[in-house]
Amino acid sequence: MHALPALSEAKENINDISFDWVVDKNFASVPSWHPLVDKIITTDHRNWKKQFFSKDTRESLRHVVNKLNEGNYDLVVDMQNNLKSAFISYLIKHDVIGMDAKSAREFPAHLAYSNKINVDKRLHAIERQKELLGKALGYKCKKNNVNFGALFKNFVKPNIELANEYIVLVQNASWITKQWSIENWQELIRRIEEKGVPMLLPSGNLEELERAKEICSISDMAQAL
């Protein structure tokens, strides 16, 4: 999500630009939301980590390496700058641009990059990725220019009546270890309910929806989406 505005701003500066996007298969829908993304190449980091030396992992990696090196790219940029993305950058037979040692999210991800760019770590992730791509492509980023460029027409609009003021509680997370307990969410809902503010809990799949419904079951002011 954080990289989408960087693509939109690149389009404002380079009219005929387009992108291929490498992403973990669990998040493959995200780049499909942006009209500038031509091809999506998926990785399978979670299974690779679980059984790195297995035959299936070797075959999966070989397939990904072939896909990564099919395109004749003008530029390859690692927007994530962590160890997982650096591993993918290492597999690409092309010079890769990424953040330098002082800027990268995880050490020593910067070692995978041929060209290293300094980006202020104090910036929000969206601004960091915009600045990285802007420096890589040679244009100056605009502050507070955040356009996700998502094709919202492809999303189903919830059939709900929104109050003038409401709170969105994002209870879902990609890793179980990052999830707050249902009991903690319900305690938060009770406290917000005391303030008289309605709450919405969005979900991205059926499992998340069931969890959101359980969390909301204690209050008529909380709604699972």
State what each model feature region is:
Residues 1-225:
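Catalytic machinery of carbohydrate-active enzymes
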